[in-house]
C-alpha cells in the first residue's frame, strides 16, 4: 500500500523524514523540555487539518496562545479533536475514543503529547510499576494497530530520564517503545540552536541531523 506523508512544515525535520510523517505507522519524538516537541506536533496538526481531521490527545495542557501562533486561522483548528487527559487511565480511554474517530471521521493524524508524562507520575508508586509498564506497551500496541488498520499517522512525544547506572539521558519506556515506534526522532539543545537527529526509520538514512530554531511561527527552517 502506498503510504501518505504529512509534512511537518519544517524543512529541517522534513528533510530527515523524506518529506514528512508517514501514515500507517508510529513516529516517536523524544527530547528534554524546550526542544520543540509540542511545537512540532502543532505544526503537524495544522498541516493535516488543511485536508483532514486530527485527533490530539493532550496530557500536559496546550497553550492557547501557542495554538493561535501556529494555526493562525481558528477555523482550521476546528478540524482538530482535542482530548485533555489528566490521569494515565484516562489516556487509554482517549486512545480508544480516537480509534472511533478514525472509523467515523476523516481522521488522518493521531497525536499523543506527551505519551509518557502521566505514565511517569504513576511510576512513583512501586507497587504499580509492572502493571503500569504493561499498560503503556498495550496502549502503544493499540496505536500501532490503529495506524495500520486505518492508514493514519500516529505521533507520540516522549520525555527523557537520566539512567542512574550510566549517567546517560535516555527516552522513557525502554525497549518496548523503541521497538513499537517505527520512526524515532531525537530533539536536543545545541547552544542557542536545537538539533534533530533521525534515530530510526524504515527507509531514510539513520543518524542524519539538522539544526533549527523555535520561533513564534514554529520550527525554522
UniProtKB/Swiss-Prot annotation:
Gene3D superfamilies attached to this UniProt entry: P-loop containing nucleotide triphosphate hydrolases (3.40.50.300)
InterPro entries associated with the record: AAA+_ATPase (IPR003593), DNA_recomb/repair_Rad51_C (IPR013632), DNA_repair_and_recomb_RadB (IPR011939), P-loop_NTPase (IPR027417), RecA_ATP-bd (IPR020588)
A GO molecular function held by the record: damaged DNA binding
Swiss-Prot/TrEMBL keywords: ATP-binding, DNA damage, DNA recombination, DNA-binding, Nucleotide-binding
Sites where the protein binds ATP: 31-38
Gene Ontology terms describing biological process: DNA recombination; DNA repair
SMART domains according to UniProt: AAA
Superkingdom, taxonomy of origin: Archaea
Function: Involved in DNA repair and in homologous recombination. May regulate the cleavage reactions of the branch-structured DNA. Has a very weak ATPase activity that is not stimulated by DNA. Binds DNA but does not promote DNA strands exchange.
Sequence similarity: Belongs to the eukaryotic RecA-like protein family. RadB subfamily.
Name listed for the protein in its UniProt record: DNA repair and recombination protein RadB
The organism of origin for this protein: Archaeoglobus fulgidus (strain ATCC 49558 / DSM 4304 / JCM 9628 / NBRC 100126 / VC-16)
Amino acid at each position: 500500500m502506498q503510504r501518505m506523508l504529512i509534512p511537518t512544515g519544517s524543512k529541517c525535520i522534513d528533510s530527515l523524514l523524506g518529506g514528512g510523517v508517514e501514515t500507517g505507522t508510529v513516529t516517536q519524538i523524544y527530547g528534554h523540555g524546550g526542544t520543540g516537541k509540542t511545537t512540532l506536533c502543532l505544526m503537524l496538526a495544522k498541516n493535516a487539518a488543511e485536508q483532514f481531521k486530527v485527533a490530539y490527545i493532550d496530557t500536559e495542557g496546550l497553550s492557547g496562545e501557542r495554538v493561535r501562533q501556529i494555526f493562525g486561522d481558528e477555523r482550521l483548528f476546528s478540524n482538530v479533536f482535542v482530548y485533555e487527559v489528566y490521569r494515565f487511565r484516562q489516556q487509554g480511554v482517549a486512545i480508544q475514543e480516537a480509534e472511533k474517530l478514525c472509523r467515523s471521521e476523516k481522521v488522518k493524524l493521531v497525536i499523543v503529547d506527551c505519551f509518557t508524562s502521566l505514565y511517569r507520575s504513576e511510576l512513583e508508586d512501586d507497587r504499580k510499576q509492572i502493571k503500569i509498564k504493561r499498560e503503556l506497551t498495550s496502549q502503544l500496541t493499540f496505536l500501532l494497530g490503529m495506524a495500520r488498520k486505518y492508514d493514519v499517522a500516529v505521533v507520540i512525544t516522549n520525555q527523557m530520564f537520566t539512567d542512574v547506572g550510566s549517567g546517560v539521558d535516555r527516552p522513557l519506556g525502554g525497549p518496548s517503545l523503541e521497538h513499537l515506534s517505527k520512526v524515532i526522532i531525537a530533539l536536543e539543545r545545541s547552544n542557542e540552536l536545537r538539533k534533530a537527529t533521525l534515530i530510526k526509520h524504515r527507509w531514510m538514512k539513520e543518524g542524519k541531523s539538522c539544526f533549527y530554531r523555535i520561533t513564534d511561527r514554529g520550527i525554522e527552517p
